[in-house]
C-alpha cells in the first residue's frame, strides 16, 4: 500500500489519514540515513500533503507529475510540479516524464527516491483523467526505475492511487511496478 500523499501535518485529507511518504523522508533525514531525498509522485493527483509537510526540509525534494484539472483543485507549489492536461495519453505523458527526469538529473543527485507509482493515471480509472494505457504505465515504471538505476540511486516504491470496482483488475495494475 502506501502513497497517502494528501494527508497534511495537522489533518487527514483526500482518503489519507497520515502521510507515509513525508514521514519516511523526514525520518530518513532526521536519523541521518540520507542527506537528500526525492519524493517522485506520479499519482494522477498532486501530493499536496507531502508538499505541505516537507516544505520546511530543504533536503527533501518533491516532484509531482499530475493532472492539472483533478483533485486537489488548489495545487501547492512543490520543488518541481508538472501539470498535465486531461486526456493527454501515453505519448505526451511519457515525454513529460522523460523531460522531468532529465531536469531532475541536472539539478540533484538524491541518496534515495521515494516513488509513488499511482495507477490512477489509467484510462479506465474511476478518479483519473489522463488516459494513460496499461502499456503506458508499464513503460512509465520502466523509465523511472531504469533512470535511477543507471544513476545508482535506490528507489523505494509505494503503489499509490488507483480506483476501480473490479478489484482483480486494480490489483493487476498495482502489481505492474513489481513486475518491471
Which residues make up each language-model segment?
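A general "terminal functional-core" signal
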Residues: 1-180
Amino acid at each position: 500500500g502506501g502513497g497517502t500523499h494528501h494527508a497534511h501535518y495537522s489533518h487527514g485529507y483526500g482518503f489519507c489519514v497520515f502521510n507515509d511518504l513525508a514521514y519516511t523522508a523526514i525520518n530518513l533525514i532526521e536519523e541521518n540515513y540520507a542527506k537528500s531525498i526525492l519524493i517522485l509522485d506520479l499519482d494522477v493527483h498532486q501530493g499536496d500533503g507531502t508538499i505541505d509537510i516537507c516544505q520546511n526540509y530543504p533536503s527533501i525534494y518533491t516532484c509531482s507529475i499530475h493532472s492539472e484539472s483533478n483533485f486537489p483543485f488548489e495545487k501547492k507549489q512543490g520543488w518541481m510540479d508538472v501539470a498535465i492536461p486531461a486526456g493527454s495519453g501515453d505519448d505526451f505523458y511519457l515525454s513529460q516524464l522523460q523531460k522531468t527526469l532529465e531536469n531532475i538529473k541536472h539539478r540533484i543527485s538524491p541518496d534515495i527516491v521515494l516513488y509513488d507509482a499511482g495507477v490512477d493515471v489509467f484510462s479506465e480509472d474511476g478518479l483519473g483523467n489522463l488516459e494513460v494505457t496499461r502499456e503506458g504505465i508499464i513503460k512509465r515504471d520502466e523509465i523511472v526505475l531504469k533512470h535511477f538505476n543507471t544513476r545508482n540511486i535506490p528507489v523505494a516504491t509505494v503503489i499509490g492511487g488507483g480506483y476501480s470496482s473490479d478489484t482483480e483488475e486494480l490489483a493487476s495494475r498495482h502489481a505492474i511496478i513489481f513486475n518491471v
